[in-house]
Amino acid sequence: MLEPGGLTGGTSGGSTHDISVLNSLIETTIDSVDGYRRSAQEATNSRFSQEFLARASEREQVVSALRDRVRSLGGNPEDDGSVLAAAHRAFLTLRDKVTGSDDAAVIAEVDHGESYLNGKWETALGDGGLSSETRSLIQQQYDSVREGRDTWRRVHQNMSSAG
């Protein structure tokens, strides 16, 4: 029985590497989807909530494209986020119960998460062992990831300088 993220018998060495990198991006991007959904629930400004939900939807499309590529390579795509991210969300929930949460704190956490995600994608793009097809897909999807990071970084900087 194959586990999510596992390989089928017909993968080559290059495909195995591509699948591994793609599954790592899938896992981290699922974390991003979960983070955006949590942020939408916590935001007090409805404009932020709507934008968080829109970003979650965009990230789901990214995950879908990456999963399709893993399947085309003969692998089984990841279907869960990381254990570390789940633990981090639990910590944030506890922290928020103790200290409270406001939109500035939510935006700061989104900015932090986006920076982490962006780094994972840049590392993948710098991986010389990827096939050109996989690298091309990662580059296409990275454009959406980078745009999200840039947007929230600007919002966070504006909120920080305003108060």
Predicted regions and their residues:
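Short coil/turn residues that cap or connect secondary-structure elements
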Residues: 43-47, 98, 102, 129-130, ...
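Carboxylate-rich helix-loop segments that flank metal/cofactor sites and access channels
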Residues: 2-7, 68-118
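Alpha-helical bundle segments that constitute or directly flank the non-heme di-iron/ferroxidase center
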Residues: 10-44, 104-129
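Long, non-catalytic architectural segments outside compact domain cores
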Residues: 2-14, 18, 24, 31, ...
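Conserved alpha-helical segments that form or flank metal/cofactor-binding pockets of metalloenzymes
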Residues: 50-85, 155-156
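Charged/polar positions within long, soluble alpha-helices
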Residues: 34-41, 64-71, 75, 92, ...
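Preference for long, well-ordered alpha-helical segments
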Residues: 113-163
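Alpha-helical scaffold segments that form or flank carboxylate-/histidine-based iron centers
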Residues: 17-25, 46-65, 103-109, 133-145
